[in-house]
Amino acid sequence: PKLVETRLPKGELNTEAFEDTYEILPNSEWLSQECDILIPAALEDVINKDNADKIKASLVVEAANIPTTPEADEILRKNNVDVAVDFISNLGGIRIYEAIIFRVVKIENMNDEDAAAAIVKDTVDLIRKQTRVVFEEAAKTGEFTRDVARRLFTPDKSDTPDM
């Protein structure tokens, strides 16, 4: 909460608000930090067979596209690290596109600000709903969260909207 309170108007971090004890670590050390939730959010394959066993978080939320290699997945599975998969966690861009192009969110007769808020709310609600479904199913079946997500949400051609 403290970090969130330091945001600047457009959401970026206000580094001037960081405490003097804030430490910038080499990029090779960020995975091994003590934390509850680890969020790889920039590059693919950053969690791999060489570093997955160093992860101390109990949950990885994949905000980047494909940040975890298949070999790392096996290590996370063995270490009981849950994964909120990228194709659910970071579906915001495609959902916003769908909302505008395919009109999956009804925004007619709304001003721009209300329309944007409605689209963001829809996107957040969808991510939360799908994540909840995955984690509830994983808890019920004992399956790895990525396996559940793939089983439940892998698209097929019938999911493609008609144009």
Model-inferred region functions:
Residues 25-35, 44-60:
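Rossmann-fold NAD(P) dinucleotide-binding segment
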Residues 43-44, 66:
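Short glycine-rich anion-binding loops that position phosphate/pyrophosphate groups of nucleotides
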Residues 54-163:
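Adenosine-phosphate binding glycine-rich loop
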Residues 13-16, 34-37, 57-58, 70-72:
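Short linear motifs at secondary-structure transitions and domain/linker junctions
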Residues 39-41, 63:
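Short, well-ordered coil/turn residues at beta-beta hairpins
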Residues 1-32:
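Glycine-rich phosphate/diphosphate-binding loop of Rossmann-like nucleotide-binding domains
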Residues 22-23, 39, 47, 80:
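Short, functionally important structural connectors and interaction interfaces within domains
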